[in-house]
């Protein structure tokens, strides 16, 4: 049974969820999972928003956020991250709406 996250849950900010991404050259970068979004009903996949684990805010108080779609494996512990196409307007609109709600709660 897969464990699906919903954007309406509380994050325990004392325990950071970390993930390692490996680029095409084999370089590993550690990221913190900022938010997971259940998009199964609308788009048939889930989404994750990541920030570099060592990220510091820039002069505007902002941190680079990366967004990916994924489909969890059967045991719900991992999945393959896929880039979200730039022209997937409905997906980006939903992600932005959920992210803005998440930030208002913080």
Curated annotation (Swiss-Prot):
UniProt-listed Pfam families: DUF1292
Family listed: Belongs to the UPF0473 family.
Name of the protein in question: UPF0473 protein SSU05_0068
The species this protein was found in: Streptococcus suis (strain 05ZYH33)
Highest taxon listed in the record's lineage: Bacteria
InterPro entries noted in UniProt: UPF0473
Lineage: Bacteria, Bacillati, Bacillota, Bacilli, Lactobacillales
